[in-house]
UniProtKB/Swiss-Prot annotation:
This is Hemagglutinin. Keywords: Disulfide bond, Fusion of virus membrane with host endosomal membrane, Fusion of virus membrane with host membrane, Glycoprotein, Hemagglutinin, Host cell membrane, Host membrane, Host-virus interaction, Lipoprotein, Membrane, Palmitate, Signal, Transmembrane, Viral attachment to host cell, Viral envelope protein, Viral penetration into host cytoplasm, Virion, Virus entry into host cell. It comes from the Viruses. It is found in: Virion membrane; Host apical cell membrane. Glycans are attached at N40, N74, N160, N179, N246, N317, N346. The gene is HA. Major glycoprotein, comprises over 80% of the envelope proteins present in virus particle. Residues 1-15 form the signal peptide. Belongs to the influenza viruses hemagglutinin family. GO terms for cellular component: host cell plasma membrane; membrane; viral envelope; virion membrane.
Length: 360
């Protein structure tokens, strides 16, 4: 009983020092809430990061494709897509691809009128497939195509392993052997020859030059008409005659002519058609492509690995669930973009020390 009386006396004698509520020092952490606006809390965990620009990398757990053909030295992706001699090789399969050539200005072999068609898009089209292979057989016999017989034209800028001159493996430059005369539009059917249910990408085009060269090669110096049709898409062209400055490609002879190159996508079992006059570049080997590969704009080389590939920041490792800064396309295990930093309150709402209770 005595012990109890002593305890009560201690409490009573120190009543002016008892505080109510939570005591803490002034908190520097402020969070915005949905119901109370800005609130001071005793602790927070940052949920956002602001990345810095870095090199691009291989995506963790995924095959990442940089160049279409890594082993094709001194070749642009357009060289590979058109199967330029010395630029033919294996394209590795990949679930993710880096678009590193935005506007290739040359493809070797022969001066191309890039802006007449969507040919600049061909490497990017191929890049969007997981599996890509070039057919081992030609899709048509170009020498015996309608309007022939033809000899196959070559360029000194296209040396191959057996000759100082050649041409793209995807096309045959059809030059009449004997019947160098004007012709009405001719039609050739392009069969589907891929064997695994892939999309078939068929490359074709036409050559045009000045009037003297057109007469010499084809016996007709007038503008020529061309049409391709496949998978419900039809494209028309009329060739331009003359007006081209001489241009040299990769050490070959100066060329007064130009070629226009296009492609058509054929679905499994579907036949395409090409209607043409003189100067046609008939399709030969075709691309067989399947699966999907995610494509993102970036740069080479790919160094190391990263959780995420971001068009503005390169390779990112996911240290926080959200990020601020520049918003752009990203692929992989990426943080989510937010306008302002996010914080998770892991403490309590800050309360100032309660006023001391005074004895009356």
């Amino acid at each position: 009983m005595k012990a109890i009386i002593v305890l009560l006396m201690v409490v009573t004698s120190n009543a002016d020092r008892i505080c109510t509520g939570i005591t803490s020092s002034n908190s520097p952490h402020v969070v915005k809430t949905a119901t109370q606006g800005e609130v001071n809390v005793t602790g927070v965990i940052p949920l956002t990061t602001t990345p810095t620009k870095s090199h691009f990398a291989n995506l963790k757990g995924t095959k990442t494709r940089g160049k279409l053909c890594p082993n094709c030295l001194n070749c642009t992706d357009l060289d590979v897509a058109l199967a330029r001699p010395m630029c033919i090789g294996t394209i590795p399969s990949a679930k993710a691809s880096i678009l590193h050539e935005v506007r290739p200005v040359t493809s070797g072999c022969f001066p191309i009128m890039h802006d007449r068609t969507k040919i600049r898009q061909l490497p990017n089209l191929l890049r969007g497939y997981e599996n890509i292979r070039l057919s081992t057989h030609n899709v048509i016999n170009a020498e015996r195509a309608p309007g022939g017989p033809y000899r196959l034209g070559t360029s000194g800028s296209c040396p191959n392993v057996t000759s100082r001159s050649g041409f793209f493996a995807t096309m045959a430059w059809a030059v009449p052997r004997d019947n160098k005369t004007a012709t009405n539009p001719l039609t050739v059917e392009v069969p589907y020859i891929c064997t695994k249910g892939e999309d078939q990408i068929t490359v074709w085009g036409f050559h045009s030059d000045n009037k003297i060269q057109m007469n010499k090669l084809y016996g007709d110096s007038n503008p020529q008409k061309f049409t391709s049709s496949a998978n419900g898409v039809t494209t028309h062209y009329v060739s331009q005659i003359g007006g081209f400055p001489n241009q040299t490609e990769d050490g070959g002879l100066p060329q007064s002519g130009r070629i226009v190159v296009d492609y058509m996508v054929q679905k499994p079992g579907k036949t395409g058609t090409i209607v043409y006059q003189r100067g046609v570049l008939l399709p030969q080997k075709v691309w067989c492509a399947s699966g999907r590969s995610k494509v993102i704009k970036g740069s080479l080389p790919l160094i190391g690995e990263a959780d995420c590939l971001h068009e503005k920041y390169g390779g990112l490792n996911k240290s926080k669930p959200y990020y601020t800064g520049e918003h752009a396309k990203a692929i992989g295990n990426c943080p989510i973009w937010v306008k302002t930093p996010l914080k998770l309150a892991n403490g309590t709402k800050y309360r100032p020390p309660a006023k001391l209770l005074k004895e009356r």
